[in-house]
């Protein structure tokens, strides 16, 4: 971590002459906050606990005032009632709170911020920094993202090519808790220092990036502790991950081809764990096309190759039951996981009505997710959204394990 910290400080020192020029400030531009407040009805929460008929309310507010020509604040916060599966009643979180200095060719952002990497459609193997809250009752997956405390420095080599360095404190996903076994011990969440680098080319017919991340995995990794053979425990720990990744997007007329690939070396961070590292390779390849003026169709294939998968076939008794349970906790169902994503969307009635239907097919486990969405804008402020998350498949499969999270919803929201 000393090397990464030295790198960030060196880049910051290089930026000092440019940042000094920013002191010729103009008057601040205190723009008004913007966001959305919503009232929703859901047939289930997202905590895997069979809860039904939930009324939720929440607001997502952003404010990005410019202090002068080179400095801007970024604030984004969420507050809600019954809108988070792991919390009953009121909940809230500051998702972003940062200050940004922009003095070309440097851009420096410090504070809590959402950092999203990857050009594929919603499945992004290289996206390792910002965690998600998978229990939030929101129709858009992007609203699940949470910020991390970080310093991000970007240097524009030329108008199309840039290099970005990030030094951050680790934070982790919020996941459903109701399905966790009672004999589980979870380690305390560490606050380790992490770093990442990305070389990015954008703004041309062929966009691409190469990135590297060294930090903690955002998901807990579970193992079985046989210290007491008569009462084995599940233990959840956080793993150190080094990940090398790349992505690309090629646009030609109405067509866009996208892809991502990442190779991760993941090792246990707990002293009592086995020392062997495991390796995971993930890839996505697909594309989308615009047609009939307002419609879009997207298709992708994806694959995950896992070195350390434990196949329960051939095991019996307690060992088989524990292995099946462990694989469900870690969402490990095959050494080679393959799947397909589909998405069709359209805008009609002068963009007042927007609909989308998306599906994810788990080809190994024969499970699937279907997620239609419909949004109607009465005017610039009032909006109605309805949708469905339907999961099905065997219990020992990715979407079969999420059946209790199947839900239908209707949301009335006010945009300001």
Predicted features along the sequence, with ranges:
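Residues that define the transmembrane beta-barrel architecture of outer-membrane proteins
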Residues: 51-57, 90-95, 145-149, 191-195, ...
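Detector for outer-membrane/organellar transmembrane beta-barrel domains
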Residues: 215, 249-360
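Outer-membrane beta-barrel "beta-signal"
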Residues: 340-344, 388-390, 402-416
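Membrane-embedded beta-strand positions of outer-membrane beta-barrel proteins
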Residues: 33-37, 75, 110, 153, ...
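Transmembrane beta-strand segments of Gram-negative outer membrane beta-barrel proteins
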Residues: 23-47, 55, 69-75, 355-357
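Repeated loop/turn-to-beta-strand initiation elements of outer-membrane beta-barrel proteins
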Residues: 69-74, 105-108, 160-163, 205-208, ...
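Transmembrane beta-strands of outer-membrane beta-barrel pores
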Residues: 37-43, 77-83, 103-105, 114-116, ...
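Outer membrane beta-barrel
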Residues: 64-174, 201-204, 391-393
């Amino acid at each position: 971590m000393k090397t990464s910290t030295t790198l960030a400080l060196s880049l910051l020192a290089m930026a000092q002459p440019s940042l000094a020029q920013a002191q010729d400030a103009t008057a601040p531009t205190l723009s008004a906050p913007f966001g959305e407040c919503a009232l929703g009805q859901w047939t289930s929460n997202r905590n895997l606990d069979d809860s039904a008929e939930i009324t939720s309310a929440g607001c997502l507010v952003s404010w990005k005032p410019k202090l002068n020509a080179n400095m801007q604040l970024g604030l984004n916060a969420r507050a809600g009632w019954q809108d988070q599966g792991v919390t009953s009643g009121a909940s809230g979180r500051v998702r972003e709170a940062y200050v940004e200095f922009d003095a070309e060719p440097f851009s420096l952002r410090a504070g809590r911020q959402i950092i999203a990497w990857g050009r594929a459609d919603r499945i992004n193997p290289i996206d390792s920094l910002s965690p998600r809250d998978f229990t939030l009752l929101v129709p858009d997956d992007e609203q699940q993202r949470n910020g991390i405390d970080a310093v991000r420095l970007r240097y524009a080599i030329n108008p199309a090519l840039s290099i970005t360095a990030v030094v951050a404190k680790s934070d982790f996903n919020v996941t459903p808790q109701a399905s966790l076994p009672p004999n589980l011990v979870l380690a305390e969440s560490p606050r380790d220092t992490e770093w990442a680098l990305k070389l990015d080319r954008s703004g041309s017919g062929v966009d691409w990036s190469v990135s590297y991340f060294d930090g903690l995995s955002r998901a807990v990794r579970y193992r079985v502790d046989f210290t007491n053979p008569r009462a084995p425990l599940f233990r959840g720990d956080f793993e150190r991950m080094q990940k090398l990744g790349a992505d690309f997007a090629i646009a030609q007329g109405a067509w866009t081809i996208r892809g991502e690939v990442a190779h991760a070396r993941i090792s246990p961070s707990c002293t009592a764990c086995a020392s062997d590292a495991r390796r995971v390779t993930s890839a996505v390849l697909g594309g989308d096309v615009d047609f009939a003026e307002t419609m879009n169709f997207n298709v992708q294939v994806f694959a995950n190759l896992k070195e350390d998968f434990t196949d329960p076939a051939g095991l019996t008794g307690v060992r088989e039951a524990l292995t099946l349970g462990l694989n469900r906790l870690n969402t490990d169902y095959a050494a080679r996981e393959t799947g397909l994503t589909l998405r069709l969307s359209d805008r009609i009635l002068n963009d007042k009505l927007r609909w989308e239907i998306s599906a994810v097919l788990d080809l190994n486990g024969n499970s699937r997710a279907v997620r239609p969405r419909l949004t109607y804008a009465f005017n610039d402020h009032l909006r109605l959204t309805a949708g469905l998350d339907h999961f099905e498949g065997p219990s020992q499969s990715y979407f079969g394990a999420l059946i209790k999270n199947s839900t239908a919803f209707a949301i009335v929201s006010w945009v300001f």
